[in-house]
Regions:
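Class I Rossmann-like S-adenosyl-L-methionine
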Residues: 1-98
Length: 98
């Protein structure tokens, strides 16, 4: 996975976690395990990087954010490397609007 694809995967996971939090659904650990069980192509380093991004967003925000993208954009304000992954590439998230 490219860094941008890892960011997109974290956004997708955060969206699922946010929905589950609002509806009293499964825990984040369970959702992460299910997500990667369906995506066997992701290697251990990819899974670790995505998981770390997801938990960093959860720890940093406290409150339930509007979306996974909003959560990672909040992290990207302090992390230039993360902000650079919002490049609009084929498997990455849409670019950050100025």
């Amino acid at each position: 996975m490219t860094p941008a694809a890892r960011t997109q995967a974290a956004i997708e996971l955060l969206d699922a976690i946010i929905l589950a939090a609002r509806e009293g659904g499964a825990a984040a650990d369970t959702l992460i395990a299910r997500y990667f069980a369906q995506r066997r192509y992701a290697g251990s380093k990819d899974r670790r990087a995505v998981r770390d991004l997801v938990y960093a967003a959860i720890r940093a925000l406290g409150e339930v954010p509007a979306s996974g993208r909003a959560a990672l954009l909040a992290l990207a304000t302090d992390d230039a490397a993360l902000a650079a992954t919002f490049d609009g590439s084929s498997h990455g998230p849409a670019p950050i609007a100025a």
